[in-house]
């Protein structure tokens, strides 16, 4: 194995995922995973509404909204930047899989769609996270005036949990959908496309701007 390892030119894109449609038990198990992930999304939205309904002083709410408007301007600008990055990444993906790997145009488009979904997922979670944080900030500050330490802890704790659960749920839904509905010979490449898009969005939104 060690002597022939240098001759094995393969990577994650060459992984062939089995056809789960022929294995009813495995298919249903993964479908249950998607259902549980949707429950995670619902949990995140419920916590968002609960945090939003917590009372706070109008002046604190105005400050929180002002911070969000500033963050929204940043998000819109970063969205334009991500579009430019995605165009460059799409060219690289199309060249590698279409020219070097000699995949069909249809298969390359599937991989490109996976990368776009990755960027949109990361961008959507960043938007949700910033909005949730600005809502929680004003409520936490107002709650601190009541001198109730547990309530002060619970608001940012629930806000952070909801953001994390929404992030993981979106990633699991997409990954399980790739396993179930994308042909096995394309699944590995789609995972790479999704990972590139997700990482690209995360790095641009977090490193470039430093909002988090």
Question: Which positions does each model-derived feature cover?
Answer:
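Hydrophobic, small-residue-rich transmembrane alpha-helices and their short perimembrane loops
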Residues: 9-212
């Amino acid at each position: 194995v060690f002597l022939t390892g240098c001759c094995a030119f393969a990577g994650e894109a060459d992984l062939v995922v089995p056809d789960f449609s022929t294995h009813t038990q495995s298919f249903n198990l993964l479908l249950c995973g998607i259902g549980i992930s949707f429950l995670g999304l619902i949990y995140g939205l419920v916590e968002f509404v609960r945090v939003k309904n917590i009372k706070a002083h109008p002046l604190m709410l105005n400050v929180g909204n002002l911070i969000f408007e500033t963050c929204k301007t940043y998000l819109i600008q970063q969205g334009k930047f991500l579009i430019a990055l995605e165009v460059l990444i799409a060219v690289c993906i199309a060249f590698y899989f279409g020219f070097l790997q000699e995949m069909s145009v249809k298969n390359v488009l599937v991989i490109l769609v996976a990368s776009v979904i990755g960027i949109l997922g990361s961008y959507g979670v960043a938007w949700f996270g910033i909005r949730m944080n600005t809502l929680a900030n004003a409520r936490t500050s107002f709650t601190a005036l009541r001198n109730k330490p547990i309530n002060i802890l619970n608001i940012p704790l629930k806000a952070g949990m909801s953001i994390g659960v929404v992030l993981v749920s979106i990633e699991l839904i997409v990954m399980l959908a790739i396993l179930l509905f994308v042909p096995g010979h394309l699944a590995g490449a789609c995972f790479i496309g999704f990972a590139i898009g997700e990482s690209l969005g995360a790095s641009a939104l977090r490193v470039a701007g430093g909002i988090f």
